[in-house]
Amino acid sequence: MRMSAWPRTLTKSWRWHASRIFACASSVRPAAQAIRASKSYMEPKHSELHSSVDRIGRVIDQHLNVFHIETALNNRMFDGPLAFLGKREEDFTDFDRAALAGLRWTLQRTPRALRQNVFHKVPAAYGLIACAAGRTELTHEKILQACRRQLFVKVRGQADILIAGIPYISPYNVNSILNPLLVQVMACGYFFNMNRGVPLVKKGGTLIVTHPCMDEFDPVQHPSYIEFFHRLLPETRDAMTLHMKYEREFAQNPSYVHLYRKGNAYHGAHPFYMWYWGENGRQHLGQIIAVGTENTHVPELMGWERADTLAEAIDMARGRQGRSAGITLMHHPPMVMTEVALAGGDGLRQLPEHGGASAAKPGIAAKEQP
């Protein structure tokens, strides 16, 4: 969470300052190019996206007196009767196991709309674990340190097959539907990139996700997503082609502009950025399989395969990766980021970029706050 306090009175030289800022912004690569040039989204030193934003921020800091305030929250998505959902299954008590069985029984018999409504109303137990203030980049680094202590988990070796369950929520569907494009961005954009150094799955590996992939969109929040998914993806899935051929059309569409300004809709160009955000995952992975999909056309439009059960998906993945393929399950919640140690000539080696993670369990607020 980032916030900057701007000066109350802007000087007469503001126009010159603004021209410098906008000149810097205009030199930023298009998102599709910046993402392709990024080794990782979550490592600032390896991300062209971070470099672009930092460059703009430095220009602003040079000409304006910015006081930056930034905070970090804990990782507790569930509290109270649902707190057990944030545990590892091997840590479950008998009561937790009974609660999980009862929850699954209830959800299987509850209409989807009601399930979504109930879960969106369940409050998270978020709390402050760090607060820093001062100069922009120094403040941001303090908060990154707190996030690393909370999120990083050490893993030995990359997987041939990675399994991840897609949740009902993302940053872009609060009180709304997780539509197919958002399923894609969670799988190939967020979960795939939740790592430091190297991805959790090998180059050319298989990602198995579990989600019904229903062909449902919210016309109030995501109107341009509908056209993007059903009109553009049947033509091409190439991010650069989509950017060059269609992004400006969607950004300037009068209807989408009106809904963005006057309604509750995301910007008309927003679905493009959701597709770009999955670019690194699509380029790295050799196979993506969706388990339990309600249809065949949604995964096909995204270039995915489908399976009815997890066992079937694992068999399909082993057919590509080999019968001895290593399998890793990415467990959510809580949210984690992995530090993968690779086997080298002198044992295991860690790809360095930041200091190591603390021994604190993921999902527990770091005790040493910056």
Regions found by a protein language model. Name each.
Residues 65-66, 206, 287, 326:
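Residues at the starts of beta-strands that form the adenosine-phosphate
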Residues 75-79, 169-173, 215-219, 296-299, ...:
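Flexible loop/turn segments at secondary-structure boundaries
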Residues 82, 89-90, 275-356, 361-370:
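Extended hydrophobic packing segments that form well-structured cores
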Residues 172-184, 217-230, 303, 337-346:
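Short glycine/threonine-rich loop-to-helix capping motif typified by GTGT followed
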Residues 183-288:
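C-terminal catalytic subdomain
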